[in-house]
Amino acid sequence: ATAAASAADAGVVAGDAAPDSPGPLPGAVARYIDHTILKPDATRTQVATICDEAREHVFKSVCVNQAWTRFVNDRLRGSGVLTCTVVGFPLGAAAPAVKAAETRQAIRDGAKEIDMVVNVGALKAGEDELVLADIRAVVEACRDGGAICKVIIETALLTDEEKRRACELSVQARAHFVKTSTGFAKGGATTEDVALMAS
């Protein structure tokens, strides 16, 4: 699903490439990028800079913590760049109802994409029903608000079997995308994890 959606987005600008071009233009690549600022000490000036960079390069979205959602949405208005907000970030340890409420608030504030963190502890404990309920709560809130739901599974904390199960549960819950990591754990995205998740 990720590749298909991204390819469709890239196609908007890919036509500008020369017939013998070795690959996509920078503009096509830009439509794959979620320009992100999630550090706890981010200031209004820093968030504004991220927004302005995203507008300049026509990135896919700007991803921020909940407190900045309305500000980012206002700053990006008319640019074609989407507002993305994280939910249950970075630990994933909130109750499903809390994540759903956070999602609904983010959508009211203008978010078009939600990056939720799965309940990693429940996943590692084999509590699949809880994990499924966790993801579904956010997916349903996204569906009701017309937003995209992406599930962050925090691969650095998982075994390969747990990564597979997290992806399967995300698909079962009808999430739109699955992502590797928050950037706050001991490791981030690897090509091996991406290949495993896509298999």
What label would you give each PLM region?
Residues 1-33:
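Charged, compositionally biased N-terminal leader segments and the immediate start
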Residues 20-57, 61, 67-199:
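Alpha/beta enzyme core
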